[in-house]
Amino acid sequence: MTRISRRSLIMLALLLLAVPAAAQGTDKVQRLTVPITDPARPITVHVSLMSGGIVMEAHEGKQVMIEVVPEDDGEAKERSGGMRVIPNRSLGLTVEEEDNEVSIGSDYSSKIEKLVIKVPRKTSVSASNVNDGDISVRGLEGELELNSVNGSITATDVAGSVVAHTTNGEVKVSFTSIQAGKSMSFVSFNGDVDVTFPSNLKADLHLTAGQGDIYTDFEFDLVPVESQTKSEREGKKFVVKLDQDVRARIEGGGAEMHFKTWNGSIYIRKAK
């Protein structure tokens, strides 16, 4: 199947999704199956939403299956003069697949409460959202890059590597195995950072917890760090800032793991 015909099929499916729920039955959830160019190879999924949550789960199939849960418009309200609201059911969603890469995106007018995306287990993910939803990933094997502004990030029973950053929310990750030698990063501005690693973890930890504490049940060695002094002039004031993180080494060291939170605590757990 050529690239053009594949995109045409996906866009046709999206047009069908836009049919009002009343014409399709009482189920407001819209569903779309995305064919993959070569199901024998791992895939990569890129998801970007302005508004709405993202849920990604592993399944045993070879396709990407998307469920779109629209916002609840509520019942149409009476307007002055007897006028009533006509619901706008445009999803504002775009899906493309090319050479085992699936891109899913929304525009500013999207009316999505959340996407539930089922993918083959060996899938790498780049997912981001801004408002009105969290990011949740379960059971995947690959490289995960997860970014949110106003939501929490959860990755459960994943294998490979994770970069998870959010501004307002918690970061919680549990690994079944990790990619040896791969650096990772876990950051929240307003929330706890809680990561569970396999018991055989070897890593060099870079830790910053501005207003909180750092906890671990791994055996570790602290690594001496020189304080970094930054000076700058702010108007008529001369400001000196002292910046120092905590460095620790587990089992002789390994890949660099960065943990950072300003208004929260850091938990580094050993899987039981």
Describe the role of every protein-language-model region.
Residues 18-20:
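N-terminal signal peptide c-region/cleavage motif recognized by signal peptidases
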Residues 188-192, 201-203:
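Repeat-solenoid scaffold signature
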Residues 23-128, 138-139, 145, 162-165, ...:
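Acidic (Asp/Glu) and glycine-rich low-complexity loops/linkers
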Residues 183-186, 194-197:
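A contiguous pocket-lining binding segment that forms or flanks enzyme active sites
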Residues 1-10:
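Bacterial N-terminal signal peptides that target proteins for export
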Residues 71, 133, 151, 169, ...:
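Hydrophobic lipid-interacting interfaces of membrane-associated proteins
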Residues 154, 158:
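Basic (Lys/Arg-enriched) interaction patch that binds polyanionic ligands
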